[in-house]
Regions:
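Short, basic (Lys/Arg/His-rich) helix/loop patches that form interaction surfaces
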Residues: 124, 132-191
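Basic, Lys/Arg- and aromatic-enriched nucleic-acid-binding interface segment
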Residues: 8-39
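Conserved tyrosine-mediated DNA breakage-rejoining catalytic core shared by Y-recombinases
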Residues: 45-100
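Catalytic-site neighborhood detector that most strongly recognizes the C-terminal catalytic loop/helix
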Residues: 193-218
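The alpha-helix within a helix-turn-helix
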Residues: 32, 43, 190
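C-terminal secondary-structure termini that scaffold catalytic or DNA-interacting sites
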Residues: 79-80, 219-228
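Residue-level marker of regulatory loop/turn positions in helix-turn-helix DNA-binding domains and
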Residues: 3, 20-22, 31, 160, ...
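Major-groove DNA-contacting interfaces characterized by cationic-aromatic clusters
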Residues: 85-134, 138
């Protein structure tokens, strides 16, 4: 059985673990969780695809997602490609954390002569396989962090997470559940997720716990940094 979500109270810990343990993909994990990007869409991202706009005192990030192979020298670099070219908005969860991550990432990992946002240890565009390996380390360390917690519920959740299968698809599930809790409109969910097939979005309507103003409260609290 696959897990498609993380309980909201552990989501910040998940992001923080990525920042501490795998900083080279921490921004990518955030973009997956709060922008719904697939793994292949993360590694296909170029700096020119990132647009930041400011409305009032709030900033917004839009990503232009296109099917592009940044590592033509590796036949298996982009296994899934970008399934649907689109403009994707990233939810600004946890106050200014997105901007902190983005600035730190640029400063540390932006390489001259390489347009890719995510790069490997050699400074080349990161492949699907490398991202997957780095995420596997995150999974391990996240479970370990929960297991070592003094909180009984966190320890129990660590056991749960180690019992079932999950990988990068989990982040997209987190995003889908956040959106599904805010609307009962399947077309809207599909649009946010970049789905062509409505059945993919429908599963998040049938699985959701609540779909009322409580969902909008969750998104608002995530923005303010009050959850996690």
């Amino acid at each position: 059985e696959l897990i498609h979500n993380i309980e909201p109270e552990y989501l910040y810990t998940f992001i923080k673990t990525a920042m501490d343990e795998v900083p080279d993909i921490a921004l990518g994990v955030f973009l997956q969780c709060f922008g719904g990007l697939r793994k292949s869409e993360v590694v296909s991202l170029e700096y020119k695809n990132i647009s930041i706009t400011t409305v009032g005192d709030k900033k917004s990030m839009q990503l232009t997602l296109k099917d592009k192979d940044l590592r033509e020298d590796v036949s298996t670099a982009f296994l899934a490609h970008c399934k649907r070219n689109r403009i994707q908005t990233v939810l600004p969860a946890y106050d200014d954390l997105l901007w902190e991550l983005f600035e730190k990432h640029k400063k540390r990992y932006k390489k001259e002569g390489c347009s890719a946002v995510f790069v490997d240890a050699d400074g080349r565009a990161m492949t699907d396989a490398v991202y997957y390996k780095r995420f596997s380390i995150l999974k391990e360390r996240f479970i370990e962090r929960l297991r070592n917690s003094d909180n009984f519920d966190a320890k129990s959740y660590a056991v749960y997470l180690s019992t079932y299968k999950w990988s990068t698809h989990l982040c997209r599930g987190i995003f889908s559940n956040l959106i599904a809790q805010g609307t009962d409109n399947i077309m809207e969910i599909a649009a946010w997720r970049g789905d062509k097939n409505l059945s993919s979005a429908l599963s998040y309507l049938t699985d959701r716990k609540q779909m009322d103003e409580n969902a909008l409260r969750i998104l608002d609290e995530l923005y303010k940094g009050e959850i996690g």
